[in-house]
UniProtKB/Swiss-Prot annotation:
Main localisation: secreted
Protein name: Pancreatic polypeptide prohormone
Organism placement in taxonomy: Eukaryota, Metazoa, Chordata, Craniata, Vertebrata
Keywords: Amidation, Cleavage on pair of basic residues, Hormone, Secreted, Signal
Stored PANTHER family: NEUROPEPTIDE Y/PANCREATIC HORMONE/PEPTIDE YY, PANCREATIC POLYPEPTIDE PROHORMONE
Top-rank taxon, per record: Eukaryota
Signal peptide as annotated in the record: 1-29
Organism from which the protein derives: Canis lupus familiaris
Amino acid sequence: MPAACRCLFLLLLSACVALLLQPPLGTRGAPLEPVYPGDDATPEQMAQYAAELRRYINMLTRPRYGKRDRGEMRDILEWGSPHAAAPRELMDE
C-alpha cells in the first residue's frame, strides 16, 4: 500500500509541475502579441516580425464557427423559437 500511495503522489506532483511549466498565453488562450524589434532592426528581424504579426492577426480574426460561449447559448435557448406565438398579455395591448 505505501508503494501505491507513493506512486499516486508522484503522479499528482508531476501533473502539477507539467501544468506550471506551460508557456504563458494571453486571455482565453490567445497568442501573445509579437514584440516590435525597434526602428534600427535588420530587414530579417523586420520580416520575422511581419510574419509573426500576420500569424497573430490571423489567429485573432479567424472565424470560430460553432464556438459560442455557454452563457450565450443559455440566453438564446431562453428566448424560445422565433416562430412561437406571443404571450397573451402582449397581444391584448
